[in-house]
Amino acid sequence: LLPHMADLAKDHVLVALLAEQDYRAASFLDQRLLGERVGREWRLWDALPDLGQAPRPDFIFHIGHVGSTLASRLIAEASDTLPLREPMLLRTLAQVAERIDRPESVWSPDLYRQRLAQTLGWLGRGFHPGQRAIVKASSVITAIADDLTGTDARAMFLYVPLPRYIETILAGDA
């Protein structure tokens, strides 16, 4: 089960039923994932189990187009790692974190920390004992990297020098 996305106004989470192969095959865990064959159901956030004691996932952070999706695929193929490429729920958490200290914030800082711990527990689960999960975060998620990794998580950050990055962006589609 993947906690796919949140409806903050209703305090619901869309849970998608995925097999391990679905995670491996998905380029990204975004809206394109929700085809007709994927079972899904909206659930109250508080009705979902708290897996805060589950292992935290490892992370790949990146800025721009630097091969992070390829790195995620290679790690998953070379090991028994479960790849989670750009889960949408993390994007929602980053948006909440951006406004957490402002009066218009939808969550209090305490609720943000609680929901973050729940989300990390959900994303850290594997399909069998000992299987690690690795999240390839989207670029905007890098803003909450400290919140996601804590003091004991494993993470890598991918980037390219600015001149090479500019060349790549200006070159357009290959």
Identify the residue ranges that each predicted region occupies.
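Glycine-rich phosphate-binding loop used to anchor ATP phosphates in small-molecule kinases
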Residues: 120, 124-147
